[in-house]
């Protein structure tokens, strides 16, 4: 459905495509789907982005099923093209882990593989034309549930939702804490925060610089999950916004712009998945090092 066919202005069209399907508790105590951005905001912490959650879980299930099917069908004979592609991905991730992670853990390679493929699949949804699936959702909402189609919101790219990217980065942050404390102990971990980057030999100067070290190290430590999340979110949100802006143009111009941008965006979605994976490995490697 072209943008011109909507009874929406350009601004309303953009806002509609950048709004999540949100379910939550209203201030009056009722639970409902938000029909406006204001209603979604009023739901506060109880707001659930059903579209982001559904797509991310669904793509995670698809990822597990695909790899399970390939593992079941794997044999020593001539592999299929799909099996060869999966093996190339696994070997690429495994070599990246071996080259970057210097500790000992059987968790890192499967974690890195999950992060890379899962984020890649979520990013890949950005290549689906912006109106296709939301149009189906609006049709179902209007004809099955009697909703106003202009108030049926349905985003299909989970990585354009900061809640998804922050959730993933916070999981990585918990692992960083776990590996840091496991390898260095609580005292060693606290000492690393309190005695770096300034660690003079004079005990008085050392004591005076502990608050400065704590502030600097805590800011650096807490910035890691935030930067991980916002980097992925920002790049994918910007890419989605460009696709939406292209959809507002006349049909004959859309193809001239969307195809080159989609081809370039293939590099972006792959690179963002790779960067998130590599930074996760680097952070966990740093957490596993003893000083």
From Swiss-Prot:
Main location: membrane
Sorted UniProt keywords: ATP synthesis, Cell inner membrane, Cell membrane, CF(0), Hydrogen ion transport, Ion transport, Membrane, Transmembrane, Transmembrane helix, Transport
Subcellular location, record wording: Cell inner membrane
GO cellular component, one term: proton-transporting ATP synthase complex
CDD domains found in the cross-reference section: ATP-synt_Fo_a_6 (cd00310)
Stretches that traverse the bilayer: 50-70, 108-128, 129-149, 161-181, 203-223, 241-261, 262-282
InterPro entries per record: ATP_syn_F0_a_bact/chloroplast (IPR045082), ATP_synth_F0_asu (IPR000568), ATP_synth_F0_asu_AS (IPR023011), F0_ATP_A_sf (IPR035908)
Listed Pfam families: ATP-synt_A
SUPFAM superfamilies recorded: F1F0 ATP synthase subunit A
Topology in membrane: Multi-pass membrane protein
GO molecular function, one term: proton-transporting ATP synthase activity, rotational mechanism
Single GO biological process annotation from the record: proton motive force-driven plasma membrane ATP synthesis
Gene3D superfamilies noted in UniProt: ATP synthase, F0 complex, subunit A
Oligomer and partners: F-type ATPases have 2 components, CF(1) - the catalytic core - and CF(0) - the membrane proton channel. CF(1) has five subunits: alpha(3), beta(3), gamma(1), delta(1), epsilon(1). CF(0) has three main subunits: a(1), b(2) and c(9-12). The alpha and beta chains form an alternating ring which encloses part of the gamma chain. CF(1) is attached to CF(0) by a central stalk formed by the gamma and epsilon chains, while a peripheral stalk is formed by the delta and b chains.
Protein family (similarity comment): Belongs to the ATPase A chain family.
UniProt function note: Key component of the proton channel; it plays a direct role in the translocation of protons across the membrane.
Protein name: ATP synthase subunit a
